[in-house]
């Protein structure tokens, strides 16, 4: 075996750099167009395959995750199971793209049941927002069956929140309300000033306040007496177990409080009784500040908007408005592809229906004789007629029993409808069609 003499710098500049960029572009960072990390895209692709023929049927999450390898995902089904469980829950998503059936966790207890016991299917949310799938770009890796990215009409990367860490880069995008993102996309489409979308956490009843580019996520409480209060919401980073172990138990162990659990199906709840060792000011503002601090009711988060762009390259944004503007410009090109394709489709459908209707009339009138001729003879005859030459196989393949006046009339009406549809697509534009897409989002 021949050994190559290489220094450390060469290895770092080549293999290490290649691996670092692989983790950035193919594992940890979401795509700005469809909002998916690769594993999520594979899960959706597998769920879409299973939905063919019956969109309503639920499938075991283990079955969905187990099939991603056949689509070109080679990093193990455990990560696909975890991704699927997160995509289907409602407590962590403003806009779930999978419907879940079974125990997918909650804000109080976040862990989902084992994937063999829970079921999922593609959500109506996906079908309502992801359009033009037939025009989605093919992935450069031939073994990668899903497209390079799907084509939602709003930047779904902003809806549910996403985080990821790769070599040298990290992303942390907060969840935003669907309605505010939709509004911002429409403003960008119309060339208006774009309003920053509202940060909104799913199933959170507290308050989210922006302060100097950061966001404070504030829990809530209310005093039920001078020495007792009821905590009704806690910051989003906590589940029940973590909040109890990090906040309530230490305060109780210090002799400051006693507490009772009042969590239930409607969310968090903790009944707190202050002991005399815990002093509270008579000043309302000071008392509130102490409660918020001591009971961990303030969480601070900031955004780090690092994504993969439509060219498959890393891109960092200073704010979500710039991302939305770029998203709209990219997405408009695919709406134009839809329009161009519809023009061709309807033109072809019109000409075929018209040719069939005309052909039937000629057969009925006796100007074209079908009976007694071989397929080859009829093909040669029709090929010489310009109107029929592009559709010879379809005309020759028509059932002779369907060549009636009623069928000719029906085809003429179909041709008229396709002609009108063709005229519509010729006169519409990207802004009109994109606006219609947005209006369909409820």
UniProtKB/Swiss-Prot annotation:
Cofactor(s) needed by this chain: Mg(2+)
Domain Topo IIA-type catalytic: 29-438
GO cellular component, one term: protein-containing complex
Highest taxon in the source lineage: Viruses
Substrates-to-products reaction catalysed: ATP-dependent breakage, passage and rejoining of double-stranded DNA
Family: Belongs to the type II topoisomerase family.
Known partners and oligomeric status: Part of the DNA topoisomerase complex made of gp39, gp52 and gp60.
Name listed for the protein in its UniProt record: DNA topoisomerase medium subunit
Gene symbol of the encoding locus: 52
């Amino acid at each position: 075996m021949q050994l190559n003499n290489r220094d450390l710098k060469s290895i770092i500049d080549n293999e290490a750099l290649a691996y670092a960029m692989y983790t950035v572009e193919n594992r940890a960072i979401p795509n700005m167009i469809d909002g998916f990390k690769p594993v999520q895209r594979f899960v959706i692709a597998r769920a879409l395959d299973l939905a063919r023929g019956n969109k309503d049927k639920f499938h075991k999450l283990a079955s969905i995750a187990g099939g991603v390898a056949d689509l070109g995902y080679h990093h193990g089904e455990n990560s696909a199971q975890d991704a699927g469980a997160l995509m289907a829950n409602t407590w962590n998503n403003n806009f779930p793209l999978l419907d879940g059936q079974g125990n997918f966790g909650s804000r109080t207890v976040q862990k989902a049941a084992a994937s063999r016991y829970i079921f999922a299917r593609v959500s109506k949310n996906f079908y309502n927002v992801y359009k033009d799938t037939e025009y989605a770009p093919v992935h450069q890796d031939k073994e990668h069956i899903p497209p390079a990215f799907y084509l939602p009409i709003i930047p779904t990367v902003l809806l549910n929140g996403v985080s990821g860490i790769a070599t040298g880069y990290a992303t942390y995008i907060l969840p935003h309300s669907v309605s505010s993102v939709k509004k911002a996309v429409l403003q960008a489409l119309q060339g208006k000033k774009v309003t920053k979308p509202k940060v909104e956490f799913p199933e959170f009843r507290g308050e989210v306040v922006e302060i100097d580019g950061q966001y404070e996520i504030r829990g809530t409480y209310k005093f039920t007496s001078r020495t007792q209060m009821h905590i009704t919401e806690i910051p989003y980073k906590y589940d029940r177990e973590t909040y109890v172990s990090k906040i309530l138990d230490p305060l109780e162990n210090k002799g400051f409080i006693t507490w009772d659990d009042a969590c239930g199906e409607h969310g968090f709840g903790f009944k707190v009784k202050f002991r005399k060792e815990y002093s509270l000011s008579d000043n309302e503002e000071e008392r509130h500040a102490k409660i918020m601090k001591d009971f961990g009711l303030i969480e601070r988060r900031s955004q780090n908007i690092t994504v993969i762009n439509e060219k498959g390259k890393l891109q960092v944004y200073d704010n979500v408005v710039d991302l939305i503007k770029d998203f709209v410009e990219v997405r408009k090109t695919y709406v134009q592809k839809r329009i161009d394709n519809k023009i061709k489709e309807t033109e072809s459908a019109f000409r075929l229906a018209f040719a069939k209707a005309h052909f039937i009339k000629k057969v009925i009138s006796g100007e074209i004789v079908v009976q007694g001729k071989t397929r080859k003879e009829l093909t040669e005859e029709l090929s010489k007629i310009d109107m029929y030459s592009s559709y010879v196989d379809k005309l020759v393949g028509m059932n002779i029993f369907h060549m009636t006046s009623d069928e000719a009339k029906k085809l003429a009406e179909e041709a008229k409808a396709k002609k009108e549809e063709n005229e519509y697509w010729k006169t519409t534009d990207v802004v009109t069609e994109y606006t219609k897409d947005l209006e369909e989002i409820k």
